[in-house]
Amino acid sequence: MKPVELPGWVTEAIAPPRPLDTGGELLWEAGATLAEGPLWEEKTGSLLLVDIPAGKVHRLQPDAPSVSSLEVGAPVSSVIPRAAGGLVVTMIDTLVSVDDDGKSRTDLARFEGAGDRMNDAKCDPKGRLYAGSMSTSGGFTGSLYRVDANLEVVALVSEVGISNGLAWSSDRLSMYYIDTPLGTVDRFSYDPGTGDISDRTVVVRIDPGFGAPDGMCVDTEDHLWVAIWGGGVVLRYDPAGVLVGELEVPAPRVTSCCFGGDDYDELYVTTAREGMSDGELDRFPLSGSVFRFSAGVVGTPPVAFVG
């Protein structure tokens, strides 16, 4: 497919990390409408993330400190390194490659029947991309897809409301999944050879009054870290679904989290301002920021897309 020209990366210095009274650090006061999809990029020592409605991919380097931003077009819902070089992003109904210098993007694959737009995405241990879509009107018109190394798109789950968090167990036999309106974290049996999933069961139920599950990551102890939209927290659950820990975030709309840093013992958390009233923003002025916490455990490194 014909490449589309892009403006390239623009880099700016940002304020140094600032300690929070509740623990952790304010890493970047981004003012993002909907910061999402954080993922550690080991080769650059930076955090990748997107601001969905702004159509921007950000590369945040905590040690500089600086942020490089690239306008790829809205909405852009996830960003993942590509094993062959550059990045891949999910847009409305398309998987798109972005070259290293941010000067062009090229469509790779299309997600048929994707509902209103694509949302969260992550690679499995084999480098296959799992990407979900969503409805913006409260329906269940989304799906969860897998993109194989040959760029074939396989639909795995239908009638999805808002496809969100994905994670895999250390034995590579389970995949965890969040469809936000259901208020649950579900577990599938996962075949590492084929990438197929089956036997869906509920592991965690979130009280709707407390918030809704959004993004998710997993540590090397097979504990799940779940971002709670509307709850201002990241919750940690053991493999049986028992709540064993909580991190308070000074922004109610917590969107996602990932492990990063040299030893993958830091938890990076993204948040949003979308849909908040002026009064809410006055109470929570750091909404839309990126935060960092000492996790006390080690997380699993991300995997690049092999397609």
Where are the language model's segments positioned?
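A short helix->beta-strand "capping" segment at the edge of beta-propeller domains
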Residues: 3-31, 60-62, 200-201, 293-296, ...
